[in-house]
Structures are given as C-alpha cells and as structure tokens.
UniProtKB/Swiss-Prot annotation:
Protein name from the UniProt record: Uracil-DNA glycosylase
GO cellular component term, pick one: cytoplasm
Subcellular location: Cytoplasm
Lineage: Bacteria, Pseudomonadati, Pseudomonadota, Gammaproteobacteria, Moraxellales
Keywords assigned by UniProt, alphabetized: Cytoplasm, DNA damage, DNA repair, Hydrolase
GO molecular function: uracil DNA N-glycosylase activity
Transmembrane segments: none
Family: Belongs to the uracil-DNA glycosylase (UDG) superfamily. UNG family.
NCBIfam families xref list: PRK05254.1-1, PRK05254.1-2, PRK05254.1-4, PRK05254.1-5, ung
Length: 237
C-alpha cells in the first residue's frame, strides 16, 4: 500500500522489527491501531498497571523476525501477575515461579523428548531459534485476566498470522485449546502444519488431550522433512 507522509511518520515511531513493520504497515497506520494506542494511553493515565512493560509488548516479534519464524505457539493473553509477563506467550522471567500451564508444557516436553524439566520459565531460547511465542492479545491490566480483549489486539495478531500464512511456507502452528484453534482456522493446511491439542492449563489438561500430544517431536520431524533446522527445546539451567 502507498503510505502518506503522515502515515510514514506514524510508522517510523513504532518500535518493531523492520520485517514485521513493513509487512504489518497497513494495520499499524490504521484507525484500529490508533484506537488501541489511545486505549492504552488512557489506561496509563488512570494509573493502571499494564503487563508486560511497554518495552516488551512487541517482544515476540522483535525476538523472532518474520524470515526466522519456523514455529508459532499461540497463546491467549499475557500473565497478569507481577513480574510474570515478558511479551512471549507462556514464558515468564527467570526467578519467577512456573505458572501451572508452563509446568504442564515442561512435563509434556520431558515425556515427549526426554528433556529434563527446566528450572526456569524464560522461553527466550526458543524464540531466538524461530519459535514465535505469540499471544492473541498483547497486553493485560494487572490482576484482571482478559481485560484487554476486544480492544483491537485480536485483529493485529490475525494480521500476523495472515502474513505468515501468505509469505512463508512450512511453518508449524501449535494451537492449544479452543481459543487458539478458532484463531488458527485461517491457516492454509496445504502450506503449513497445524498441531492441535487441549490447553495445558490444569483444568483443561487434566480432562485429557494435552498430555501425550507430542507436539515437540512432531514439530521437529516436520521441520527436518522440509530441510529446516529443528528446534533445540532444551533450556539452559
């Protein structure tokens, strides 16, 4: 699309990896994004605490450029507790107690690949290798789960999925739970691999359908079949 001078100026102020910025430009300069920005400004003006910190809102995109994406793990919205969210879905800062969903993910990782259960929950190493850890909604108010849903983030992250769907091939989309699976209906199964399972939260996982899903080995097998370097899922101590 042809951008006006005003739109170019607006785009230049977005602190986002250039490959993503270029591909998402149409949304980033849209009225929907303006409304989302205004909502976040109003929240901060009301002294509401927003997670993750503003510099980490686009952490998933800035850590995993468009050309590097091999895998997408789609979450819902960020953790809403202090010092948990770091802009990567399911990930928490080092030194933070593992949330139940992440404990279950690590349990499945251990069962699937025999990898020792990590002692911390910082998934940056995965993101550095091409695992886009993307939440559907990128911000949340402290202590208020789902508080920033239906404010525009969903359309933004739909655009991210559309860009990957159209511009890339042989990406593995890991969709845990009904919410992620609905969002993933737009993915072209001819070009990409979609792996579905129950959500790793204790409530969902204990009903069955998560443990034993073997998404980690299935992901690496698919990548290797297409000549793509597999993911080293083992996290540093």
């Amino acid at each position: 699309m042809q951008l006006t001078e005003q739109q170019h100026d607006k785009l230049s102020k977005v602190q986002l990896d250039e490959s993503w910025k270029h591909s998402l430009a149409e949304f980033l300069v849209s009225s929907r994004m303006d409304e989302l920005r205004q909502f976040l400004i109003e929240q901060k003006n009301q002294d509401k605490v927003i997670y993750p910190p503003s510099k980490q809102i686009f952490n998933a995109l800035n850590t995993t450029p468009l050309s590097a994406v091999k895998v997408v793990i789609l979450g819902q919205d960020p953790y809403h507790g202090p010092n948990q969210a770091n802009g990567l879905s399911f990930s928490v800062q080092k030194g933070i107690v593992l949330p139940p969903s992440l404990r279950n993910i690590f349990h499945e990782l251990n069962t699937d690949l025999g990898i020792p259960v990590p002692k911390h929950g910082d998934l940056t190493k995965w993101a550095d290798q091409g695992v886009l850890l993307l939440n559907s909604v990128l911000t949340v108010e402290a202590g208020q789960p789902t508080s920033h849903q239906k404010r525009g983030w969903e359309q933004f992250t739909d655009s991210i999925i559309d860009v990957l769907n159209e511009q890339r091939e042989h990406v593995v989309f890991i969709l845990w739970g009904a919410y992620a699976q609905r969002k993933g209906q737009r993915i072209d199964r001819e070009k990409h691999l979609v792996l579905k399972a129950a959500h790793p939260s204790p409530l969902a996982a204990n009903r069955g359908g998560f443990f034993g899903c073997k998404v980690f080995s299935k992901t690496n097998n698919y990548l290797k079949q297409h000549g793509i370097e597999p993911i080293d899922w083992q996290l540093d101590a």
